[in-house]
Swiss-Prot record:
Protein name: Protein pelota homolog
GO cellular component: cytoplasm
Keywords, in A-Z order: Cytoplasm, Endonuclease, Hydrolase, Metal-binding, Nuclease
Family statement drawn from the similarity comment of this UniProt entry: Belongs to the eukaryotic release factor 1 family. Pelota subfamily.
Assembly and interaction partners: Monomer.
Cofactor(s) listed: a divalent metal cation
Subcellular localization, as worded in the UniProt entry: Cytoplasm
Note on domains (UniProt): The N-terminal domain has the RNA-binding Sm fold. It harbors the endoribonuclease activity.
Its job: May function in recognizing stalled ribosomes, interact with stem-loop structures in stalled mRNA molecules, and effect endonucleolytic cleavage of the mRNA. May play a role in the release non-functional ribosomes and degradation of damaged mRNAs. Has endoribonuclease activity.
An individual GO BP term: nuclear-transcribed mRNA catabolic process, no-go decay
Organism: Methanoculleus marisnigri (strain ATCC 35101 / DSM 1498 / JR1)
GO molecular function, one term: metal ion binding
Length: 341
């Protein structure tokens, strides 16, 4: 994503946002909400002028509109974000209109920007500079390819060759060739994962056949295959070493720490009421919030109070396992500096 601050005063102002990927649209779905003012160039029906009482045709022309947002919907499978609301500026003021935002579609958002919003924009901008991480889980006869979106792992395809039983060298070479053809266009980092020696042989194959890609590749030993291998890769901190700071890896580590402290009755609070109390006492060091609560006024108040007392606020995506686990314990948790009664 590209971002440009147009005007800002005491956290209120206009930021111009240019989404470039599906990840960016997902980020926008959490940055834009009801009550925000969004400006964009869009198409709207304009009646052609005629001498007749009824117009012969209706044209759609590009117009610049400002919309008071009422509803935001992220459509992952159509690569689209829908922003619906009431026109405040432009043609047909007070009428309803829906913006269909896709990659390459520029919008300007006017609102009060919370620190958690600015942090999300920073992550989105940084991620665009790295390129998307792909993980290839390799076993005998099969390779599964995943793309690591900001909201979680996305299955891309499964490559097969021969059978997992009794595979010979020729079959394995065929698998490697087909898999490399599939990931050859990857421009970001590549992680090759899996148990045993097959993943190591594939990594060596890539080094010989695609040295440029090999320069962005790392091989990782995992116990599981497929999506389970992806989870292990993230949990092992491999992505941190590849990118320095990928939010997914941080989510896994933080949520693991929350669950460990709950199991050992350590310095932790969970559930929005307990987290609010911890923040009020000044005991909260890191506050975790599920993205599903970002539209909740009560949760928003807790987030703002946490930021005022300099607690770190981390928003977890419920599209991915750590966010699902957080959602299951009330959608909010806090790692504390000390235990409170």
């Amino acid at each position: 994503m590209k971002a440009e601050v147009r005007e800002m005063k005491r956290q209120f102002g206009e930021i111009r946002l240019f989404p470039e990927t599906l990840d960016d649209l997902w980020h926008l779905s959490h940055l834009v909400g009801p009550g925000d003012l969004v400006f964009a160039t869009t198409f709207r029906s304009v009646e052609a002028a005629t001498d007749k009482l009824r117009p012969e045709k209706v044209e759609k022309r590009p117009v610049r509109l400002g919309i008071w947002v009422e509803k935001v919907e992220f459509h992952q499978h159509t690569n689209r974000l829908r922003i619906a609301g009431i026109i405040e500026s432009g043609v047909d003021v007070a009428a309803h209109h829906t913006l269909n935002v896709e990659a390459g579609f520029e919008i300007s958002v006017v609102k009060r920007w919370r620190p958690v919003d600015c942090e999300r924009i920073r992550r989105a901008v940084d991620a665009s500079a790295y390129g998307v991480v792909h993980v290839v889980s390799v076993e005998e006869g099969e390779a599964q390819i995943y793309r690591l979106r900001q909201f979680g792992p996305e299955w891309v395809t499964t490559v097969t060759a021969g059978s997992s039983k009794g595979a010979d060298t020729g079959t394995r070479s065929a698998l490697f060739e087909k898999t490399l053809d599939t990931v050859a266009a990857v421009t970001g980092p590549l992680v090759v994962a899996g148990p045993g020696f097959v993943k190591d042989e594939f990594a060596e194959y890539v080094k010989v056949r695609a040295p440029d890609l090999a320069g962005r590749m790392v091989a990782v030993e995992t116990r599981r295959i497929g999506r389970g291998a992806v989870q292990e890769v993230i949990g092992q901190g491999i992505l941190d070493r590849l990118l320095g700071d990928l939010h997914l890896a941080r989510e896994v580590a933080l949520m693991d720490e929350v669950l460990v402290r709950i199991a050992t009755e350590g310095a932790v609070a969970y559930g929005i009421d307990e987290v609010r109390k911890a923040v009020a006492y000044g005991a909260a060091e890191t506050v975790l919030v599920a993205d599903t609560l970002l539209r909740d006024d009560e949760a928003t108040g807790v987030i703002e109070q946490a930021e005022r007392v300099n607690a770190t606020v981390v928003v977890l995506s419920t599209e991915f396992e750590p966010g699902e686990r957080l959602d299951a314990i009330g959608g909010a948790a806090a790692l504390l500096r000390y235990k409170i009664e």
